From Swiss-Prot:
Protein name, as recorded: Maintenance of mitochondrial morphology protein 1
Family according to the record: Belongs to the MMM1 family.
Lineage: Eukaryota, Fungi, Dikarya, Basidiomycota, Ustilaginomycotina
Keyword terms, alphabetized: Endoplasmic reticulum, Lipid transport, Lipid-binding, Membrane, Transmembrane, Transmembrane helix, Transport
Biological processes, Gene Ontology terms: aminophospholipid transport; intermembrane lipid transfer; mitochondrial genome maintenance; mitochondrion-endoplasmic reticulum membrane tethering; protein insertion into mitochondrial outer membrane
Major place of residence: endoplasmic reticulum
Biased composition range(s): Low complexity: 311-328, 465-476
Span of domain SMP-LTD: 150-391
UniProt KW DNA-binding keyword: no
Keyword Transmembrane helix among UniProt keywords: yes
A Pfam family this chain is assigned to: MMM1
Membrane topology of this protein: Single-pass type I membrane protein
């Protein structure tokens, strides 16, 4: 009865109802996600490894940096600092020159002092002219033309220097010079090989040098390897270059040294807090120099021979007797310096730790090489120099008498004190810093800062047309190469012989006559404070500070110079110095 009723109801509906099938338990669990095949231990290990990899990448690319990139950044930074300093220095020099010229012009117009009222200034100018004439005469008699002479080889210097290095290298390998030395005639060669003994004594010598300065946080240093190589430096391209505006010259030589110089040490870093030797870190370091190349500048510097007080070898004498016995130091010195663009190729090894060791850390290698480069720059790169004081062969009479009396009194007691204190016949070694004013020509440059500013300010087309040719005296006409006068030498040192060949230079006597007649005026056609259109005897551009010679206009010069002393050849056109 009920089934027909349900069928009637289903027939009355628009569509038959659908009843979802009831799934079985196996089919129900089949729809659920499958459990992971990774265990808890495996997941922990993968997570720790990923954290270690991230930490290593962070340390490698964030904390440490590549040594080549660091060196390039340091070079660019130094280049930018050098350019900024050069611009500021040139700007300051230009302002000072303008102020000095304006002040000199106003003072000359107001007071018009005579040359006789300044005897010290006149004597200084004459002394400067005399020294410039001496430098010009040196190059003239040695037949060395700065503008056209090619760089020379230094093969003989390489052989001689290699012999000296070989001798000193033997002294280092044997631990120092023995007091019982033998000459070449009575030396007996040892039949046994001495290589192990040489290496041991060389290590002992280096340990003695390194352990002279001790510290509380460092154990004594032990040298494990000391190799001083077997090659020699090679010098090439020797040339003469100007040193300043007064005519001094320097010798520039390219040096290249490729070898394997190795020094390896072992020590321990101590932590003495909260108690002594609370922690100890073993440290092993090694440094190898592979190649060094650069340009060496050698300059013979002589102080003023007319100085009233010469420096002594003992700057702080303890008593009057010791000061009277100390002779004056020689005024002749050899200055050795390097160009700033030297190249240093080196490598370093490191090993830190006792049980867990860190080997060849890039930061330590970069630190060691930068400290070595900084040590060279702080002691040998221009304007700093390494000086070699030459013997004082011709002392003053007073110093010679006092020294002879003191030496005779102390002949039997301290006869060797003179040689050790830097007296007669003793060569002293020291360091110093060159003056870096506007008149000094830096190594590798052809002109000083003052000359470059004056040439840049005087590059005008009207200057060449308004400059009359000057004549040459009979004394300068005897010079075949145009280097017979002070003005010609100074213009040659400045490298500004770019005028036509019919312009001539005057001699030293004519320059003195010009100063006597003109009165040190320096009259020009320009406004006060200008650095252009300055007429100098010898037909080259310059300034009072740059050339050290009083200036006169062409109208005043024509009233003093002889008119019939023209020479057909004149001065040769001299281009700037060629590196």
């Amino acid at each position: 009865m009920q089934q027909p009723q349900q069928q009637d109801l289903q027939i009355g509906l628009p569509y038959a109802p659908v009843q979802p099938p009831i799934p079985s338990p196996a089919a129900y669990f089949a729809y659920l996600p499958s459990p992971s095949r990774w265990t808890f231990t495996q997941g922990l290990i993968v997570g720790q490894v990923s954290m270690v990899i991230v930490a290593l990448l962070l340390i490698r690319y964030v904390i440490f940096e590549d040594s080549a990139t660091a060196l390039e950044k340091e070079r660019l930074m130094r280049l930018k600092v050098s350019q900024r300093r050069s611009k500021l220095h040139a700007k300051a020099l230009l302002q000072d020159a303008r102020k000095a010229n304006s002040a000199a012009a106003s003072a000359a117009a107001a007071a018009a002092p005579s040359p006789a009222s300044h005897p010290l200034r006149k004597s200084h100018r004459l002394a400067s002219d005399t020294r410039a004439s001496m430098f010009a005469n040196i190059l003239d008699k040695t037949a060395y033309d700065l503008s056209s002479h090619l760089p020379e080889s230094a093969d003989w210097l390489n052989v001689m220097f290699a012999q000296a290095i070989a001798g000193y290298r033997e002294d280092v390998l044997t631990g120092g010079v023995s007091s019982h030395h033998h000459t070449a005639s009575d030396a007996i060669p040892s039949p046994n090989p001495l290589e192990p003994q040489k290496e041991r004594t060389a290590r002992d010598l280096m340990e003695e040098i390194l352990n002279r300065a001790t510290s509380s946080f460092l154990d004594p240093i032990r040298v494990t390897e000391a190799d001083f190589g077997d090659a020699y430096p090679i010098f090439t391209n020797a040339r003469v270059r100007p040193a300043d505006d007064t005519g001094r010259t320097r010798i520039e030589i390219d040096v290249d040294y490729s070898d394997q110089i190795t020094l390896a040490i072992d020590t321990k870093l101590l932590i003495n807090f909260p108690k002594p030797r609370f922690a100890v870190l073993p440290v092993s370091l090694g440094l190898t120099i592979v190649r060094f190349s650069g340009t060496l500048a050698i300059e013979l510097f002589s102080s003023d021979p007319n100085a009233t007080v010469l420096p002594t070898a003992n700057p702080n004498p303890s008593s009057s007797s010791s000061s009277s016995a100390t002779p004056p130091r020689s005024r002749h010195q050899l200055h050795f310096s390097l160009h700033p663009d030297f190249a240093l190729e080196a490598s370093a090894t490191s090993l830190l730790g006792s049980r867990a060791k860190l080997q060849d850390i890039p930061k330590i290698e970069q630190l060691l090489i930068s400290r070595l480069r900084g040590w060279i720059m702080d002691r040998f790169v221009w304007p700093r120099y390494w000086s070699l004081t030459l013997p004082n062969l011709v002392p003053s009479p007073a110093a010679s008498r006092s020294f002879s009396a003191a030496a005779a009194a102390n002949r039997h007691t301290d006869a060797a004190s003179v040689g050790s204190s830097g007296g007669h016949g003793q060569i002293n070694v020291g360091t110093g810093v060159e003056r870096t004013d506007a008149s000094v020509i830096q190594p590798g440059h052809h002109e000083s800062a003052r000359q470059e500013m004056l040439h840049a300010a005087s590059e005008r087309p009207s200057l060449a047309s308004s400059r009359p040719p000057h004549v040459r005296s009979s004394s300068s006409g005897l010079r075949a190469n145009g280097m017979g006068s002070v003005e010609a030498w100074r213009a040659h040192a400045a490298g500004v012989y770019n005028q036509p060949s019919h312009q001539h230079a005057t001699s030293l006597n004519q320059a003195a006559l010009l100063r006597a007649h003109v009165g040190g005026g320096g009259a020009t056609d320009c406004a006060p404070g200008s650095d252009v259109n300055i007429e100098v005897p010898g037909s080259y551009r310059g300034s009072v500070a740059g050339a050290g010679i009083e200036l006169a206009s062409s109208s005043n010069a024509s009233s003093v110079l002889p008119t019939g002393a023209h020479h057909s050849s004149g001065l040769r056109n001299r281009p700037g110095f060629v590196q």
